[in-house]
Protein backbone atom coordinates (compact mmCIF):
# COMPACT_ATOMS: atom_id res chain seq x y z
CA UNK A 1 0.00 0.00 0.00
CA UNK A 2 1.14 3.53 -0.72
CA UNK A 3 0.32 6.26 1.82
CA UNK A 4 0.72 10.04 1.76
CA UNK A 5 2.39 11.63 4.77
CA UNK A 6 0.67 14.97 4.31
CA UNK A 7 -0.97 16.03 7.58
CA UNK A 8 0.29 19.47 8.59
CA UNK A 9 -0.89 19.31 12.19
CA UNK A 10 0.51 22.70 13.30
CA UNK A 11 0.14 24.95 10.22
CA UNK A 12 0.55 28.30 11.99
CA UNK A 13 3.92 27.45 13.55
CA UNK A 14 5.18 24.84 11.05
CA UNK A 15 3.57 25.31 7.61
CA UNK A 16 6.34 23.63 5.57
CA UNK A 17 4.99 20.66 3.59
CA UNK A 18 7.45 18.59 1.58
CA UNK A 19 5.93 15.87 -0.61
CA UNK A 20 6.26 12.55 1.22
CA UNK A 21 4.95 9.05 0.53
CA UNK A 22 5.64 5.67 2.08
CA UNK A 23 5.08 2.29 0.47
CA UNK A 24 4.31 -0.45 3.00
CA UNK A 25 4.77 -4.15 2.23
CA UNK A 26 5.55 -7.26 4.22
CA UNK A 27 6.16 -10.97 4.15
CA UNK A 28 6.05 -13.34 7.10
CA UNK A 29 9.46 -12.16 8.41
CA UNK A 30 9.96 -8.56 7.31
CA UNK A 31 8.22 -5.21 7.10
CA UNK A 32 9.33 -3.19 4.05
CA UNK A 33 9.01 0.61 4.12
CA UNK A 34 10.03 2.79 1.18
CA UNK A 35 9.86 6.54 1.75
CA UNK A 36 10.06 9.07 -1.08
CA UNK A 37 10.64 12.72 -0.18
CA UNK A 38 10.72 15.89 -2.28
CA UNK A 39 11.48 19.13 -0.46
CA UNK A 40 13.34 22.43 -0.35
CA UNK A 41 16.20 21.52 1.97
CA UNK A 42 18.06 18.52 3.29
CA UNK A 43 20.28 17.98 6.33
CA UNK A 44 22.17 14.97 7.72
CA UNK A 45 24.47 15.76 10.65
CA UNK A 46 23.91 12.60 12.73
CA UNK A 47 25.83 9.54 11.50
CA UNK A 48 25.54 7.14 14.47
CA UNK A 49 22.57 5.01 15.48
CA UNK A 50 20.62 6.17 18.54
CA UNK A 51 21.69 9.79 17.90
CA UNK A 52 19.34 12.77 17.34
CA UNK A 53 18.29 11.84 13.79
CA UNK A 54 15.00 13.78 14.15
CA UNK A 55 17.00 17.02 13.97
CA UNK A 56 18.01 16.05 10.41
CA UNK A 57 15.85 15.33 7.37
CA UNK A 58 14.14 12.32 8.90
CA UNK A 59 11.35 9.82 8.25
CA UNK A 60 9.75 7.87 11.06
CA UNK A 61 7.51 4.88 11.70
CA UNK A 62 5.80 4.23 15.04
CA UNK A 63 3.72 1.10 15.60
CA UNK A 64 1.86 -0.78 18.29
CA UNK A 65 0.50 -4.31 18.25
CA UNK A 66 -3.18 -4.04 19.29
CA UNK A 67 -3.58 -4.93 22.95
CA UNK A 68 0.05 -4.25 23.90
CA UNK A 69 1.05 -1.36 26.15
CA UNK A 70 4.43 -0.77 24.45
CA UNK A 71 4.92 0.72 21.01
CA UNK A 72 8.01 0.79 18.79
CA UNK A 73 9.59 3.81 17.15
CA UNK A 74 11.88 3.61 14.12
CA UNK A 75 13.38 6.97 13.06
CA UNK A 76 15.83 7.25 10.16
CA UNK A 77 17.59 10.27 8.70
CA UNK A 78 18.28 10.61 4.98
CA UNK A 79 21.71 8.90 5.23
CA UNK A 80 20.55 5.86 7.24
CA UNK A 81 21.39 6.70 10.85
CA UNK A 82 18.54 5.43 13.04
CA UNK A 83 16.89 5.57 16.43
CA UNK A 84 14.87 2.56 17.55
CA UNK A 85 13.18 1.54 20.78
CA UNK A 86 10.20 0.00 22.54
CA UNK A 87 8.45 2.31 24.98
CA UNK A 88 5.25 3.21 26.79
CA UNK A 89 5.56 6.94 26.07
CA UNK A 90 7.97 9.71 25.09
CA UNK A 91 10.02 9.25 28.26
CA UNK A 92 8.18 6.36 29.93
CA UNK A 93 9.88 2.96 30.20
CA UNK A 94 12.06 3.50 27.12
CA UNK A 95 13.98 0.40 26.01
CA UNK A 96 16.38 1.29 23.18
CA UNK A 97 17.10 -1.47 20.71
CA UNK A 98 20.54 -2.99 21.21
CA UNK A 99 23.33 -2.49 18.65
CA UNK A 100 22.68 -6.06 17.44
CA UNK A 101 18.95 -5.33 17.00
CA UNK A 102 19.69 -2.06 15.21
CA UNK A 103 22.11 -3.92 12.95
CA UNK A 104 19.32 -6.26 11.85
CA UNK A 105 17.33 -3.34 10.39
CA UNK A 106 18.43 -3.14 6.76
CA UNK A 107 18.62 0.35 5.26
CA UNK A 108 19.20 1.73 1.83
CA UNK A 109 19.29 5.47 1.20
CA UNK A 110 19.72 7.56 -1.92
CA UNK A 111 22.35 9.67 -0.10
CA UNK A 112 25.68 8.07 0.91
CA UNK A 113 26.31 7.55 4.64
CA UNK A 114 28.28 10.79 5.00
CA UNK A 115 27.29 13.74 7.19
CA UNK A 116 26.50 17.12 5.66
CA UNK A 117 25.14 20.43 6.90
CA UNK A 118 21.86 21.77 5.60
CA UNK A 119 21.66 22.33 1.85
CA UNK A 120 19.10 24.54 0.13
CA UNK A 121 17.52 23.68 -3.20
CA UNK A 122 15.03 21.14 -4.47
CA UNK A 123 15.95 17.63 -3.34
CA UNK A 124 14.39 14.26 -3.99
CA UNK A 125 15.56 11.38 -1.83
CA UNK A 126 14.46 8.00 -0.60
CA UNK A 127 14.94 5.68 2.37
CA UNK A 128 14.19 1.96 2.26
CA UNK A 129 13.88 0.10 5.55
CA UNK A 130 13.57 -3.65 6.06
CA UNK A 131 12.49 -4.21 9.66
CA UNK A 132 12.42 -7.74 11.11
CA UNK A 133 8.87 -8.38 12.32
CA UNK A 134 10.19 -10.03 15.49
CA UNK A 135 11.38 -6.59 16.66
CA UNK A 136 7.74 -5.46 16.57
CA UNK A 137 6.00 -8.68 17.59
CA UNK A 138 8.08 -9.56 20.66
CA UNK A 139 5.44 -11.36 22.69
CA UNK A 140 3.55 -13.09 19.91
CA UNK A 141 4.04 -14.30 16.39
CA UNK A 142 1.96 -12.38 13.85
CA UNK A 143 -0.91 -14.17 12.15
CA UNK A 144 -1.91 -12.78 8.79
CA UNK A 145 -3.89 -10.76 8.06
CA UNK A 146 -2.54 -8.85 11.08
CA UNK A 147 -3.75 -5.43 12.23
CA UNK A 148 -1.15 -2.94 13.41
CA UNK A 149 -1.66 0.52 14.94
CA UNK A 150 0.72 2.93 13.21
CA UNK A 151 1.69 6.42 12.26
CA UNK A 152 4.24 7.59 9.72
CA UNK A 153 6.10 10.87 10.01
CA UNK A 154 8.46 13.29 8.28
CA UNK A 155 10.33 15.86 10.34
CA UNK A 156 13.41 18.06 10.29
CA UNK A 157 13.60 19.81 13.66
CA UNK A 158 16.86 21.73 13.15
CA UNK A 159 16.47 22.90 9.56
CA UNK A 160 15.67 26.46 8.48
CA UNK A 161 12.13 25.27 7.74
CA UNK A 162 11.32 22.81 10.53
CA UNK A 163 8.31 20.62 9.85
CA UNK A 164 6.34 17.83 11.48
CA UNK A 165 4.16 15.91 9.04
CA UNK A 166 2.17 12.78 9.83
CA UNK A 167 0.06 10.25 7.98
CA UNK A 168 -2.69 10.15 10.63
CA UNK A 169 -3.77 13.46 12.26
CA UNK A 170 -2.43 14.45 15.69
CA UNK A 171 -4.91 16.85 17.36
CA UNK A 172 -2.53 18.34 19.94
CA UNK A 173 -1.51 21.99 20.48
CA UNK A 174 2.20 21.38 19.77
CA UNK A 175 4.31 18.78 17.92
CA UNK A 176 4.51 15.37 19.59
CA UNK A 177 4.75 12.13 17.64
CA UNK A 178 4.83 9.93 20.76
CA UNK A 179 1.04 9.63 20.91
CA UNK A 180 -0.17 6.07 20.25
CA UNK A 181 -3.72 7.21 21.02
CA UNK A 182 -3.63 8.95 17.62
CA UNK A 183 -2.21 6.06 15.60
CA UNK A 184 -4.18 4.89 12.60
CA UNK A 185 -4.47 1.25 11.55
CA UNK A 186 -3.08 -0.83 8.72
CA UNK A 187 -3.36 -4.51 7.96
CA UNK A 188 -0.36 -6.67 7.17
CA UNK A 189 -1.14 -9.51 4.76
Give names to the regions the model predicted.
Residues 1-189:
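Structural preference for beta-rich elements and adjacent junctions enriched in aromatics
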Amino acid sequence: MKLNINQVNWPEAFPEKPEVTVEVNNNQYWLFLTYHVKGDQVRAVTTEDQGPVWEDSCVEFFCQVPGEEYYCNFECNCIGAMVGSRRKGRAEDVKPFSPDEMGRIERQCSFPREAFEEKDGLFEWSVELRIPLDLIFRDQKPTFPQKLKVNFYKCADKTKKPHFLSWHPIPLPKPDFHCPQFFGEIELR
